[in-house]
Every structure is written in C-alpha cells, then in structure tokens.
Amino acid sequence: MLTLPKLDIERNEDAEDALVETTKTWLADEGKERDPRIHASDLLDPRKAYWNRQHKEELDARMTGNFFVGKVLHAFFSTAMNKKKGLSLVDTDVGGTWDKSLGISFSNDWEKKIKSKDSPNGIPYELKTSRALNEQTKKDMASYLEQLCIYMAAKLSLVGRLVVLRLMAKDNLKGWGTYPQYRAYEVRWTKKSLNEYREQIKSTVKLLTKALKTKTKKDIKMLPLCREWKCGKGNCGHWDLCKPETRYGTTKWK
C-alpha cells in the first residue's frame, strides 16, 4: 500500500460545466444521425414528440448525464451481445429499422435471431438501467415495457426479453454494499393483445402525423398526453407551450 502525501483538493465547478458542455455537444452530434421520421419512442410521449420538432429542447445537466450514461451502457450491451471487438455506437437508438405497416422507425437494443411460431422474425430485447436500491416489482416495470411492446408488435412476436441493469443492487451474498447486477425477464402476450397494441400504435402515428402537418391547436390537443413522470414544469421544457389540459394550472402540477 502506498501512503499518500498531503494533498490540496478543491472542487472545480468550471471544469464540471465544461465537461457537461462537451458531453452535450457529443450527444447532439450523435443525434443528427437519427431517422427524422416518427420513432418508436415518440409514441410514448406524443405531445413531447410534437413540440420537440417545433422547438428543440436543449439538454440540461440532468438530461445530459442521464442520456450519456444510457447511450454508453447501451453501446456496451449491444457490442457484447453481438460479440464484436471494440465498442460500437451504431444503432443505439437511431432508428435502424423502418416498419412500413406501422409507420415508425425503431431500433431494439438487441435481437435473438431465431424463428419460431411465437417469434417469426426473432425475439426483441430491451435494455433498461435502474438506480433503485430495492428489488423492483412487476408494477414498477410498467414504464420499461412500453417500448419493448412496440418492438414485439413490429416483429409480430408473442415473446420479448426485458433486461434491467440494476446499477445499485444490494450485494445479498456479502450482506453489505452494492454492485451492478442484471435482471432478465421473459415477456409474453396473446395474439389478440399484439394486434390491439399494433392498432394503438397506428392510431397514435396517425394523430402525430396529422398534428405535425397541420400544426393546429385542435390537432395538437388530439394527441394523447405524455407519461406523468415526463410532464410538469420541472420535467418538461415545453410545459408552457403545451399547456396540457387537466394538468396545466392545477395544484398538483404546479
């Protein structure tokens, strides 16, 4: 063991700001490769998708940190699963596949290329990260499944795989501390549910396409509201532009 000498250590907030700006620029440049058409993720928060195309929201420090970690971890996951050498950022949420029948671009995080009765076009995978300390319940994972279900619908698959990388999972073996741990889940639905979800997708795509074309208040208001955790003055830079009905101006959403 080496004994450290006396050191002067001072936090440098200017350097931190510079790092955020550098990361923000890199993320913006990477985003230029994204397919400009409607993406699977646009369907989760349709109003946000509309307003972001009219007034691009600049990333703040929080968003920059979250997107950066997510993009890097997805790149490592994709590279490892595809058994590639080095690190590949290709197809990390850029919309690598266009589905004409649904009218969306999408890029599932990985795909098990097997063909079966339940999965005629392969089994799609979705990777999510979580900083939760406690084990998550099925109810907790609802927000993780929305995008996976879009991939399953596009692939006409009755089965999908959800992988959650728990960054702060407790070390139950040692009884103390935390370390990143995988949780893997198989997700299934019926043919009826698959077809119903496809119709939901088509309906939302139709509404978003029309709103983007007409830009009228009437058509914008026809778009489904965004997920609650993505909405609100503190969570969305378009809050005062969107003014979502039943939320804007109410006590709960101030």
Predicted regions and their residues:
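Non-catalytic surface loops within mature trypsin-like serine protease
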Residues: 114-116, 129, 191, 240
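Metal-dependent nuclease catalytic cores that hydrolyze phosphodiester bonds in DNA/RNA
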Residues: 1-124, 131-135
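Soluble or luminal CAZymes and related metallo-dependent hydrolases
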Residues: 69-73, 143, 193-196, 200
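Mid-sequence acidic-hydrophobic segments that form the walls
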Residues: 84, 113, 131, 154, ...
